[in-house]
C-alpha cells in the first residue's frame, strides 16, 4: 500500500520536475508558483475528486522555491501550512531572505577570491526565485519529535542538515516498512547540492554545511529506513546503499581538494580547479562545493585557513 501518490510537477529550473506528494487532503511540497505547475497540481487533485479548496494541509520539507511556491495559493484556498521552526521566517519573508543571502554571500565570495563584479552578478541571480515563491504564513511550526496526522497515518518530524536551511523529514510506517519523505536530502541518481548557508542571524558564524551534512547522512543511515520518498525523480528503495554512495562521492572529492591546497589557495581557485570556467549561473553551486570540502578538511584538522588583507586561503596540513 502506498500512503502517498507522487505527482511530478514541472519547474523552470535545471533540476527538472519536483515531486509533490498527495495523501487524502494533504499535499507535500506542492511545487513552484507558476501556471503550469498549478494546472498540474489541480489536475492531480481532480483525479482524486478534490479541488484546491479541499486541501487541508500543506507540508513543506524545505524552503526552496521549487518545493514551496504553490503553498501560498493553497493556503489562500483554505489549507494550513506546516514547516520547521527554522524555515518559518524564511517562508514568511522570502524576499527578505534573498536580500540577506545576497548581502552575506557577496562579501563572503569576495573574501574567497572572487572579483567584486562577479560576486555581484552571482549573488544577484537568485532574485529571480521570488517570482516562483511568494511568501506564505506558516500555521504550524514543527520541531524534531513532533507528529502530523496525514490520512490516518502518523508522521514524525526529524531534522535534516545539508541541502537547505530548516529542512526536515516526515517519517512513517506502512506495510511494515519504515519510510520517510526526505525532500532533496537524498536523491536516487544525482548527488544533492550541499548549498552554502548564511548564519541564522546577521553577525553569527557561518554554518559549516558539508561536515554537518556528512554527519546527518550517517545518522540517517543508522535510522534503518526502508524507503525514501524524494523531492526529485524516483524514490530510493535502498536508502543505506544510496547514502553510502553519496558519502563515498563526498570523501573522494574531499581528497581531491586536499591535493589542490598543498600551498595556500583561495576557495575560488579550488572551484576553478574542480569545475573549470563555470558560468555565473553555476558559480554559487561551485563555491558551495569548494568551500564545503575545505570546511571538511578544516574540521578534521587537515587544512589551515588564514585571512590576509581580506582574502581567505587554505593550506593542507601534512
Label for each model-derived stretch:
Residues 23, 29, 62, 74, ...:
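Divalent metal-coordination and catalytic microenvironments
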Residues 33-34, 152-244, 248-249:
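Metallo-beta-lactamase
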Residues 247-259:
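Gly/Ser/Thr-rich active-site loops/lids in small-molecule metabolic enzymes
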Residues 256-318:
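C-terminal regulatory/interaction regions
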Amino acid at each position: 500500500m502506498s500512503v502517498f501518490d507522487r505527482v511530478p510537477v514541472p519547474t523552470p529550473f535545471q533540476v527538472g520536475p519536483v515531486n509533490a506528494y498527495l495523501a487524502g487532503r494533504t499535499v507535500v511540497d506542492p511545487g513552484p508558483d507558476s501556471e503550469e505547475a498549478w494546472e498540474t497540481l489541480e489536475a492531480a487533485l481532480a483525479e482524486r475528486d478534490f479541488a484546491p479548496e479541499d486541501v487541508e494541509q500543506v507540508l513543506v520539507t524545505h524552503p526552496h522555491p521549487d518545493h514551496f511556491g504553490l503553498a501560498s495559493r493553497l493556503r489562500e484556498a483554505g489549507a494550513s501550512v506546516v514547516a520547521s521552526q527554522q524555515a518559518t521566517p524564511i517562508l514568511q519573508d522570502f524576499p527578505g531572505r534573498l536580500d540577506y543571502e545576497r548581502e552575506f554571500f557577496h562579501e563572503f565570495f569576495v573574501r574567497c577570491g572572487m572579483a567584486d563584479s562577479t560576486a555581484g552578478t552571482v549573488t544577484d541571480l537568485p532574485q529571480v526565485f521570488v517570482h516562483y515563491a511568494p511568501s506564505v504564513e506558516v500555521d504550524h511550526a514543527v520541531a524534531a519529535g513532533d507528529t502530523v496526522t496525514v490520512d490516518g497515518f502518523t508522521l514524525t518530524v526529524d531534522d535534516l542538515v545539508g541541502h537547505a536551511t530548516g529542512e526536515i523529514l516526515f517519517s512513517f510506517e506502512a506495510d511494515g516498512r519504515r519510510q520517510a519523505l526526505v525532500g532533496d536530502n537524498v536523491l536516487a541518481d544525482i548527488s544533492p547540492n550541499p548549498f552554502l548557508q548564511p548564519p541564522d542571524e546577521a553577525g553569527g558564524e557561518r554554518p559549516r554545511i558539508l561536515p554537518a551534512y556528512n554527519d546527518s547522512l550517517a545518522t540517517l543511515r543508522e535510522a534503518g529506513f526502508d524507503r525514501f520518498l524524494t523531492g526529485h525523480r524516483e524514490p530510493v528503495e535502498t536508502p543505506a546503499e544510496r547514502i553510502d554512495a553519496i558519502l563515498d562521492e563526498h570523501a573522494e572529492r574531499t581528497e581531491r581538494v586536499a591535493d589542490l591546497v598543498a600551498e595556500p589557495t583561495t576557495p575560488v581557485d579550488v572551484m576553478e580547479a574542480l569545475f573549470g570556467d563555470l558560468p555565473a549561473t553555476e558559480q554559487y553551486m561551485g563555491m558551495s562545493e569548494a568551500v564545503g570540502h575545505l570546511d571538511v578538511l578544516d574540521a578534521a584538522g587537515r587544512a589551515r585557513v588564514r585571512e590576509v588583507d581580506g582574502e581567505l586561503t587554505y593550506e593542507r596540513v601534512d
